[in-house]
Amino acid sequence: MELSPELLRKLETLAKIRLSPEEEALLLQDLKRILDFVDALPRVEEGGAEEALGRLREDEPRPSLPQAEALALAPEAEDGFFRVPPVLE
């Protein structure tokens, strides 16, 4: 997939963000590298995947951050929930 500056501007509009020309250039480079990486994935040898999975730690439940502490870290909270800007108009 070819990533053009026009497509990047369309993505900016969809994401409702504004980037400076410098940020656009950097993001365009990063996205091209990511797409090249994803494009290369089908050509990667699959051997050794089982071995890699064995290295993961076990999932163990642990205490999480109390709700009051989590909400205290948020810019805005209301009635025990995070308050965020509307996504849909």
Swiss-Prot record:
It catalyses: L-glutamyl-tRNA(Gln) + L-glutamine + ATP + H2O = L-glutaminyl-tRNA(Gln) + L-glutamate + ADP + phosphate + H(+); L-aspartyl-tRNA(Asn) + L-glutamine + ATP + H2O = L-asparaginyl-tRNA(Asn) + L-glutamate + ADP + phosphate + 2 H(+). The keyword RNA-binding does not apply. GO terms for biological process: glutaminyl-tRNAGln biosynthesis via transamidation; regulation of translational fidelity; translation. Pfam families: GatC (PF02686). One of its GO terms (molecular function) is asparaginyl-tRNA synthase (glutamine-hydrolyzing) activity. InterPro entries: Asp/Glu-ADT_sf_sub_c, GatC. The keyword Ion transport does not apply. Its EC number is 6.3.5.-. SUPFAM superfamilies: Glu-tRNAGln amidotransferase C subunit. Keywords: ATP-binding, Ligase, Nucleotide-binding, Protein biosynthesis. Heterotrimer of A, B and C subunits. Belongs to the GatC family. Allows the formation of correctly charged Asn-tRNA(Asn) or Gln-tRNA(Gln) through the transamidation of misacylated Asp-tRNA(Asn) or Glu-tRNA(Gln) in organisms which lack either or both of asparaginyl-tRNA or glutaminyl-tRNA synthetases. The reaction takes place in the presence of glutamine and ATP through an activated phospho-Asp-tRNA(Asn) or phospho-Glu-tRNA(Gln). This is Glutamyl-tRNA(Gln) amidotransferase subunit C. It comes from Thermus thermophilus (strain ATCC 27634 / DSM 579 / HB8). The lineage of its organism: Bacteria, Thermotogati, Deinococcota, Deinococci, Thermales.
